[in-house]
Amino acid sequence: MSRVGKAPIALPKGAEVNVAAGVLSVKGPLGTLSQPIHSLVKVNVENDTLTFAPADESREANALQGTMRALAANMVKGVTTGFERKLNLVGVGYRAQLQGTALKLQLGFSHDVIHEMPEGVKAETPTQTEILIKGADKQKVGQVAAEVRAYRPPEPYKGKGVRYSDERVILKETKKK
């Protein structure tokens, strides 16, 4: 059995779990998330705990048990506390600001880059060079952060660009004769 999949998920106050028609849905103060349940995984909800079991003894069922448990744990955490990624803009004249739901970035191009936020994801700019991306869906938050970073990834010589706050950019030395 999967070691990750065996661990039960404790449901915090304010989180409701519903399993119906092969779909697991979690509702909480920050919204509702749903995930289809694979046919090789059984889901049990009892006494504010969520447990997963493989439907048969195959390796695939064991692997999917751990995967489904990890996805469900992320859903429960997302609807109760949420997820966030912090990005830093490093470079002269690099700045970010919000325009409604869109993020306006000045990244050294001849034009401003405007990134529309998908539904369920919010952006904040505490300072001109910091971006906070928040949401209930871990996958969406990470995807939006990766898309914003991709506009101008950190370059290896001066380190200019958009980087995650916990990212270390290893600088190269310039070529010398």
UniProtKB/Swiss-Prot annotation:
It comes from the Bacteria. PROSITE patterns: RIBOSOMAL_L6_1. The keyword Transferase does not apply. GO terms for biological process: cytoplasmic translation. One of its GO terms (molecular function) is rRNA binding. Pfam families: Ribosomal_L6. GO terms for cellular component: cytosolic large ribosomal subunit. Keywords: Ribonucleoprotein, Ribosomal protein, RNA-binding, rRNA-binding. This protein binds to the 23S rRNA, and is important in its secondary structure. It is located near the subunit interface in the base of the L7/L12 stalk, and near the tRNA binding site of the peptidyltransferase center. Belongs to the universal ribosomal protein uL6 family. NCBIfam families: L6_bact (TIGR03654). Part of the 50S ribosomal subunit. This is Large ribosomal subunit protein uL6. It comes from Cupriavidus taiwanensis (strain DSM 17343 / BCRC 17206 / CCUG 44338 / CIP 107171 / LMG 19424 / R1) (Ralstonia taiwanensis (strain LMG 19424)). The gene is rplF.
